[in-house]
């Protein structure tokens, strides 16, 4: 089934054509953005020095490296107001304040969490592409054909040929799905013609649920007090309040550790600079606003497709607006054969209307109009053929049934043959006589 597309379809490199712009912002653009950010953060951790600590003078280089590694793995804590003025600490005893100060232990996990967030954005797309493959109308292949046609813009006739071919293929798939006894007998949701839009709405809801989950991840992972921390951080930056006051993404923190020798245990409190937080602040503040934008776009897209799915008249008007531009539809209007409602409801079904909208969004109005015009012509030709066949069947005379069962009563004669049967028998006898009079001279008779 898919192989018929290969002669005129280029390799399908991305599934962007099987959804709308809101989906692409989620699974494609946002996932790419998060993946790139994860690479940058991982490089700053494992290639550079993510944390640098001020250790006592008696520490050797090995001790210093141990202290920095320990503090990076264990985590540090921030002293509010301790570094507000020229590095003069307002807290004289970190040991007394450590239990009341916020711990900073998220920077070690930033690359891993970013990768997880990127996967969550891509997960609804995987679900969409996996389940729509169970439908006879393969969205990926149909979208690939329309995308291939969009890349040829130099010659209008080429566009028309592509749109016409796509319309024929689309109609063929719809007709097979609508007429196939396999789908009718099973009574599955695929046969109802509403599978694709229902699945698409479910995927839209998953995209929106992922946005809500992402806000929760940011709030919990960064240990902020409110999910609006992104806006609050932006306001603080505009007002000149830096991390020394707010404590969000602190650059300078404290770390406590102990070193044991042969006779005693020595406790140390050192001051560390978390270099990675400088980059993490920019990444996460930007991502918060990006997440808000994608969330609003997803809500609008979900509302748009929900209205289209629930109001059948909206889908009809969409198809009518493109059919009215085609000569095939105008010809039917002139004849008085106005049957677009049957075309939309019986031929396209909600699945076909849904795919037509995706084609329009990715290939343009002209392509969609030519495609629907070709499909409408094929539909009218098919309906005319059905009507003609029905008239022929009704015009045929009903022949009397012949009882071919053996009867023990020899006196009961066979029913007389009908006129058509008698003519057939007469012609057969004439053919036999002709064969006897004119034998085949090339035939070899057995001795």
Curated annotation (Swiss-Prot):
Top-level taxon: Eukaryota
Tagged with keyword tRNA processing: no
GO molecular function: gap junction channel activity; gap junction hemi-channel activity
Acidic residues: compositionally biased ranges: 426-438
A single cellular component GO annotation: plasma membrane
Main location (coarse class): membrane
Residues covered by region (Disordered): 389-447
Disulfide-bond pairs as recorded: none
Topology in the lipid bilayer: Multi-pass membrane protein
Parts of the chain that traverse the membrane: 30-47, 108-128, 198-218, 283-303
GO BP terms in the entry: monoatomic ion transmembrane transport
This protein's UniProt keywords: Cell junction, Cell membrane, Gap junction, Ion channel, Ion transport, Membrane, Transmembrane, Transmembrane helix, Transport
PANTHER family named in the record: INNEXIN (PTHR11893), INNEXIN-5 (PTHR11893:SF36)
Name of the protein: Innexin-5
Organism taxonomic ancestry: Eukaryota, Metazoa, Ecdysozoa, Nematoda, Chromadorea
Gene: inx-5
